[in-house]
């Protein structure tokens, strides 16, 4: 007989009276007064199998099966008795009366129960094969697969061609650290794994392929965070002969269709916000618009106050002073406690802030006397009045302040805004709106100044085109040069980012010069690109989405590792296979590599 006629989770009342053959895993076995019930599981879900003692041979097998045994069942689909249906299962109205039961493979005792939700990540990643059997992980992986298929179908209909680009490429030490692969054939030389297929896809545009995509792995050897992996999957796209707005329109439609089809969610309109506005209002280039808190600009107000923390920042070059108004944060009942405020003070220090000044607005009508804070005595009346007026503060509100270099203020108070908005207090007091909040952030600066190295670096990458009319600013005032760059942001996560690229060799050389990459270096690192741009390169641009991030958002998973089959830990290790691991001396010799501090040989 066939090993399987149907998936367990797809057996419904449509099959009543039919004999089915199922193969799967024993999720649970229950002995109810002489009748044995087996919950049989496969990737599509569960079905209840009933084993009656009137078939003694089959019943003996049923008595011996345990959780996670791999078994095959042949039986009759019948309606469950009244009062025993389970509406949470597709198969909840039926059960399978077992006629034959074969153990395909027994299982040792599993390291954890499949329904245990309190497992440590170390346990889950060490026993990843078993973790992947759990319905939670199977749902995540199925959604990932369905989303990837839908993206491919969408791009295919839009005329995009799937072209693979090399995994072994040239190392260019711009941006994040490369993963290097030593060449055995070319002594002392190295390939790099791609951080993105950026230059290959641009050259495909020069080659006339017009619309390209691939769903591909990218690699970055950087310190990991909750939403980062050393290898990640990108939906990588490039187009020719489309302007910035046209490119954004295609991919906005793609993401909207994915959410509609996979989740039944209408993402609605995507507002567009400039980088400048996002940083000014929210201190972030990927603002979470679900949080209803905004910065109030106070730099000009604080220039002449006696409180040196504020006046010092207000008068320093590149300094900034802002307030963050927390409605209801100073109320006697239900406001933020002293402990919570102290916790937030420690929290902002992570981002370089030296502390967190605040004012409690107890009674606005009393002016200075209605405000509670050690800093009030050092701020003159006109400044206090302006603070209250600009923030729109009401009785019971709490005002937090940030004063430092602009980057520190934006990072620290921007993070505080999210922390307060997502807190229990924020959710109870209407400071957080539970919805999908997409937007485009556009008009990024072309360059930012690296203080440590005292040089300009590219905000996106050095192949991004400046806005029309901004080319000369690269020579005269790089800080004012705006790029044709855009990011799609959803709920405070950057889902995808892209730009219109430089398609003229002279402009590309100018950007390299602004980044302090001299002519010789340009030829050595990017000569092939500069050459390609001279052969009538078309205007082109594109975008790349992080598939892992997209699925994390769609599933509501707590970690990006919950949507990747075999992820790395935050220390870039694979706990299942124990990678990375030492290699033997012979392999190193073939690669012309000697370790400076060799590991002791394992015994």
From Swiss-Prot:
Record CDD domains: AspRS_core, EcAspRS_like_N
Superkingdom, natural source: Bacteria
Alphabetized UniProt keyword annotations: Aminoacyl-tRNA synthetase, ATP-binding, Cytoplasm, Ligase, Nucleotide-binding, Protein biosynthesis
Coiled coil: none
Catalytic activity: tRNA(Asx) + L-aspartate + ATP = L-aspartyl-tRNA(Asx) + AMP + diphosphate
Gene Ontology MF annotations: aspartate-tRNA ligase activity; aspartate-tRNA(Asn) ligase activity; ATP binding; nucleic acid binding
GO BP field: aspartyl-tRNA aminoacylation
Subcellular location: Cytoplasm
Residues the record lists as binding ATP: 220-222, 229, 494, 546-549
Residues involved in L-aspartate binding: 174, 220, 460, 501
GO annotation, cellular component aspect: cytoplasm
PROSITE patterns: AA_TRNA_LIGASE_II
EC number from the UniProt entry: 6.1.1.23
Cited function: Aspartyl-tRNA synthetase with relaxed tRNA specificity since it is able to aspartylate not only its cognate tRNA(Asp) but also tRNA(Asn). Reaction proceeds in two steps: L-aspartate is first activated by ATP to form Asp-AMP and then transferred to the acceptor end of tRNA(Asp/Asn).
PANTHER family in alphabetical order: ASPARTATE--TRNA LIGASE, MITOCHONDRIAL, ASPARTYL/LYSYL-TRNA SYNTHETASE
Stored NCBIfam families: aspS_bact, PRK00476.1
Protein family per UniProt: Belongs to the class-II aminoacyl-tRNA synthetase family. Type 1 subfamily.
HAMAP family per record: Asp_tRNA_synth_type1
Name of the featured protein: Aspartate--tRNA(Asp/Asn) ligase
Organism placement in taxonomy: Bacteria, Pseudomonadati, Pseudomonadota, Betaproteobacteria, Burkholderiales
Gene this protein is translated from: aspS
